[in-house]
């Protein structure tokens, strides 16, 4: 008993740095946190891990639909050695997404809660206050509706590249993006959580061995979109110094909306709230339990597309809004004015963004459906509003993507390529051009590889599917069994590129294929079994859509490419 007491007293009165003989304890501005050391087979460098460190107050009660507030201080040593709950979401879908995307070998059972504003930290075990290592802040994807920090184990990236990895969480769905379009609930709560996490990093990361003057934000899909939003936001000035958007930028269809009122009214109606004023709606929704809001989310069936329902009257995402806080103007205006954080920026896509994962999770164009030209047009007309595409140009686009073939498989594959281009490829090229033209160092890539960890249901011809890059970025071939030497080598190369960029704003380094800067020649890097330079990513498709949409007047309340 006496020894236990003395041990706890010692933890409460001193900070332990990089001493594997005792668990790491670190001071934060709010109190001390206790972590743990984890080892990595084949690597002498172990990693100090802190899981579930609070960066804001629980967003409950009056803090629902409100900006995050600083965490309350604590006087004890907080145990941060277990995964925090993920933010409220459909548990079955969230668990499935985690199991598909995680880089770790073992499966973990997830918990979900409205109290979820926590972050996970992975730092080399020999860290000190003076280490000043590059910091890489990860923002997960999931359509602003699913996902969490703990899907991604940062130990491999941290150990192999001597960086501090911070994986953050942010409110999702109704909790993160409900907006009435006025002062009663402006929205963008999830983005404000991301900003709060970056402030926490500035105030605390030095004690974990990180350099607050060298912070890189990186994210994939909705996380890449979030990175793109944060690049444009005045709230993040000096909070980060480099950025990486993987498979998602600010023009990702469906994730940015101009008219929030219909969705707000639908949510209020489903909750049984009066809708006479915004104040009444917000007050009513704040009284609902977490479970009641979750049931509304499930009924809205967010992310799921269906050819059986009227997609014009459905809401597939609860979206980011131009709120005059996070985003002072429409992103197109901000980019045109070149008034944003012109930090070095990597933007990339995967070769077949709509190859298998997204069609499977979102429920459109199943692999076993045979399509003729007429059916393809009908199907895409149902989704035109989501993608911001005028319905009358869909037949022209179908002709382009079916390439003269009447074969049902080729038509289906053409539709998937169509959706991949309008969702990811074209927006990524356009944002890269805008960033380049503002004078910021810009790099582009296209990832082309079939990971050995893919679902057995996935067709073998889908190479470079949505989220495939995550396995390489987080070292899945090193953590999990069954990877080939080629796959391990690819992962080490990608981690080296990302970490070099985090160190100095340039991904290049000794022993790596040269990655050219994205300038007027529009050179980029193809990353895969063979990694090589190429030029003008998706040039033909960009030209096609640019010319096609230039002939059209903007459609109200939709995000056109």
From Swiss-Prot:
The entry's note on the tissues where this protein occurs is: Expressed in liver and kidney.
An annotated GO BP = long-chain fatty-acyl-CoA catabolic process
- Specify the protein name: Liver carboxylesterase 1F
- Is DNA repair among the key words of this record? no
Return the EC number.
3.1.1.1
- Where found? Lipid droplet; Cytoplasm, Cytosol; Endoplasmic reticulum; Microsome
Q: Which family does it belong to?
A: Belongs to the type-B carboxylesterase/lipase family.
Q: Which UniProt keywords apply?
A: Cytoplasm, Disulfide bond, Endoplasmic reticulum, Glycoprotein, Hydrolase, Lipid droplet, Microsome, Serine esterase, Signal
What top-level branch of life does the organism fall under? Eukaryota
Q: Identify the glycosylated residues.
A: 79
All disulfide bonds of the chain are 87-116, 273-284
**CDD domains per UniProt:** Esterase_lipase
Query: Which organism encodes this protein?
Result: Rattus norvegicus (Rat)
Cellular component, GO annotation: cytosol; endoplasmic reticulum; intracellular membrane-bounded organelle; lipid droplet
